[in-house]
Design a protein with these regions (language model features):
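Short, flexible loop motifs at catalytic/binding sites
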Residues: 1-180
Length: 180
């Protein structure tokens, strides 16, 4: 059972129920439950993609965190076991940070250090966790403008989402604690 507190529920409602937000940015304190919230949003996006035909391209959800150890150690057990996605995945690999589902849907865990691997690909939903700690590699603004946001906007535009029968165009959740 998924249990979100009122502040988490408000963000979730705007992203997935009312679809008022396409790009949500949330700054919250330690202990707020941002990892849980981010995982719930990513899993919701996976279920939206599972409704689409196998031939629809770019059915990928990404979760990005500053390092691979962080994204793998925090999100893999949360998604696989706490949220029960091990029951829905055709295959999953903690080492690769990947979950494969029916209809060519994939959830990928990616370090910010490797964010350039997204270049040229398509993303239906992207979680970017702890942006304030993403300091290695290209700058955060450049990563958003030249890599992350284009994977969402170009492959999952309003027009393409309508053509594919998707619930919404691509979206993202940038969620972080303030640094310092």
């Amino acid at each position: 059972m998924i249990n979100l507190h009122p502040a988490q529920s408000e963000i979730y409602k705007h992203l997935f129920v009312e679809q008022k937000l396409r790009y949500a940015v949330v700054c919250c304190a330690r202990g707020w439950g941002k990892s849980y919230m981010a995982a719930v949003c990513a899993v919701t996006a996976v279920f939206e993609l599972l409704e689409l035909a196998a031939k629809v391209p770019n059915k990928t959800v990404y979760i990005i965190a500053p390092t691979y150890d962080q994204v793998k150690d925090i999100y893999f057990p949360l998604i696989a076991y706490d949220l029960g996605m091990e029951d829905y995945a055709i295959k999953m690999s903690r080492d690769l940070g990947r979950f494969w589902f029916a209809n060519n849907v994939e959830l990928r865990l990616l370090s910010y250090e490797s964010v350039e691997r997204m270049r040229g690909k398509g993303s239906y939903f992207v979680v970017w966790d702890e942006i304030s700690s993403c300091t290695k590699g290209i700058g955060a603004e450049d990563a958003w403008m030249s890599v992350i946001q284009p994977t969402i906007a170009t492959r999952w535009s309003n027009k393409r989402a309508l053509a594919y029968g998707a619930r919404s165009p691509g979206r993202s959740l940038v969620i972080s604690t303030p640094k310092g």
